[in-house]
């Protein structure tokens, strides 16, 4: 299942998972974090 209410800096797959409602991809990497 998906994890919601993630703190800034935690890995995410979509913005809805983050407290800040923003899932940002790091440049040059496939990982995204809140």
From Swiss-Prot:
Task: Decide whether keyword Disulfide bond is in the record.
Answer: yes
Q: Which GO terms describe its molecular function?
A: enzyme activator activity
Q: In which tissues is it expressed?
A: Expressed by the pancreas.
Cellular location(s): Secreted
**Which Pfam families has this protein been placed in?**
Colipase
Q: Which UniProt keywords apply?
A: Digestion, Disulfide bond, Lipid degradation, Lipid metabolism, Secreted
Q: Quaternary structure per UniProt?
A: Forms a 1:1 stoichiometric complex with pancreatic lipase.
Q: What does this protein do?
A: Colipase is a cofactor of pancreatic lipase. It allows the lipase to anchor itself to the lipid-water interface. Without colipase the enzyme is washed off by bile salts, which have an inhibitory effect on the lipase.
Any idea what this protein is called? Colipase
Task: Give the species.
Answer: Gallus gallus (Chicken)
Tell me the classification of the organism that encodes this protein: Eukaryota, Metazoa, Chordata, Craniata, Vertebrata
